[in-house]
């Protein structure tokens, strides 16, 4: 029987292993367990973030994490990268060919900026959103994954149900996400769950779903 629970620090290794099994070819997985665990730990380091998982007889089979922005400039991608910078550096030191991985090349500007912040000790200061853009009532779905052995068995729908419930409890009126344009399976699943397209490029699709609170 599937069970839902908020993820604790002690449960991060199992959630990270589920993440790596769900995305075996991703850059984060190639960096190793230490990086995957640390990047997911970012969701436990702030009140405006959350992480939960689904288990089947004690085994983690799916997970989901969200982020509620407090203003412009406090993005989840940069935050996770900076939080797990040491683990990323160690992973790339052991596998230097990852410096030429397509995902690393794409994030070179962001990586350089985060390294600079790490050296200088400066923090990314959020700017309060201008009138007309209410980021605080919007929550982003940042990470979600289902173990390959449990796809098509209702785990994804359960994750989406609890994500939506968590967003409502945080008084959000809108949920957002970004998905790769090539991830057809995920796009179909999101649309089936009521998500709509808001923007589209050759590489990614931005989606949203409004909430009745």
Q: Locations of the language-model features?
A:
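Acyl-donor (CoA/ACP) binding surface of acyl/acetyltransferases
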Residues: 148-153, 157-159, 168-174, 210-213
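Conserved acyl-donor/pantetheine-binding loop and adjacent beta-alpha core of acyl/acetyltransferases
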Residues: 72-138
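Conserved GNAT acetyl-CoA-binding A-motif
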Residues: 137-142, 167-178
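C-terminal "cap" of GNAT-fold acetyltransferases
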Residues: 173-184, 193-194, 200-213
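A short helix-loop-beta-strand connector motif used in the catalytic cores of GNAT acetyltransferases and
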Residues: 41-53, 68-76, 114-115, 140
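Conserved beta-strand in the GNAT
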Residues: 53, 59-68, 130, 140-145
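Conserved acetyl-CoA-binding loop-helix of GNAT-fold acetyltransferases
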Residues: 143-146, 152-165, 188-192
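Short amphipathic alpha-helix that is part of the acyltransferase structural core
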Residues: 1-34, 59-61, 68-95, 99-100
């Amino acid at each position: 029987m599937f069970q839902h629970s908020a993820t604790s620090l002690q449960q991060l290794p199992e959630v990270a292993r589920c993440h790596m099994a769900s995305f075996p070819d991703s850059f984060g997985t190639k960096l190793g367990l230490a990086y995957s665990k640390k990047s997911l730990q970012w969701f436990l380091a702030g009140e405006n973030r959350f992480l939960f998982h689904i288990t089947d007889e004690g085994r983690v089979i799916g997970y989901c994490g969200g982020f509620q922005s407090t203003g412009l400039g406090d993005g989840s991608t940069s935050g996770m990268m900076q939080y797990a910078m040491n683990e990323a550096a160690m992973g790339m030191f052991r596998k230097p060919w990852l410096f030429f991985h397509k995902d690393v090349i794409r994030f070179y500007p962001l990586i350089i900026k985060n390294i600079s912040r790490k050296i200088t000790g400066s923090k990314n200061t959020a700017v309060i959103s201008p009138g007309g853009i209410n980021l605080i009532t919007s929550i982003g779905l940042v990470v979600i994954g289902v173990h390959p052995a449990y796809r098509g068995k209702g785990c994804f729908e359960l994750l989406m149900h609890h994500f939506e419930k968590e967003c409502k409890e945080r008084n959000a009126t809108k949920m957002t996400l970004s998905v790769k344009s090539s991830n057809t399976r995920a796009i179909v699943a999101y649309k089936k769950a009521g998500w709509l397209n808001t923007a589209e490029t050759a590489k990614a699709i931005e989606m949203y779903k409004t909430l009745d609170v």
